[in-house]
A protein has these predicted regions:
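Short hydrophobic alpha-helical membrane-anchoring segments
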Residues: 15-19
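Eukaryotic N-terminal low-complexity, Ser/Thr- and Lys/Arg-rich leader segments
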Residues: 1-2, 20
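Beta-propeller-forming repeat regions
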Residues: 20-145
Length: 145
């Protein structure tokens, strides 16, 4: 019985490997991104950060601007150019979207790294989009957290 089970597993494994090698899981759509320059981007999240009813791809920029890409007339283009969001002097490597203040809209947490050890020069960001984009970490009551 064990021998038969082992044979079945080997056949199934070989079938999967063969099919996976020939499958096209991803498609290169980089041609539809407007102003698509070479850059380092290590993180992505999907949310409706600007509250327009459409999801944006929030793309981190490692020493490049963070982007909020959304479809406009068949192309992906950056919708947010505010300095506090773009933040190209920081080295952003991760992003997460979550409604932390329970207002029904997601905030963005940007993980920044500018050193491999020791104290960071630039802090992370926790951005909220109200009438303008603000960093909740920079509000006075949160400065010593």
């Amino acid at each position: 019985m064990l021998y038969i089970l082992n044979e079945i597993i080997c056949i199934f494994y070989n079938f999967l490997i063969t099919k996976m090698a020939s499958a096209e899981f991803f498609q290169d759509i980089s041609g539809i991104i407007k102003n698509n320059e070479e850059r380092l981007s290590y993180g992505i999240s999907v949310t409706d950060f600007n509250k327009d009813g459409q999801f944006e791809f929030i793309v981190t920029g490692f020493r490049h601007p963070n982007l909020a890409l959304s479809y406009k007339k068949g192309f992906l283009e950056n919708l947010i150019n505010e300095e506090i969001f773009s933040d190209d002097i920081r080295s952003t490597i991760g992003v997460a979207a979550c409604d932390i203040d329970n207002d029904g809209f997601e905030e963005l947490y940007f993980l920044n790294t500018d050193t491999y050890s020791g104290r960071k020069q630039y802090s992370d960001r926790l951005l909220d989009s109200q009438t303008k984009i603000i960093d909740l970490f920079e509000i006075e009551k949160n400065l010593n957290l």
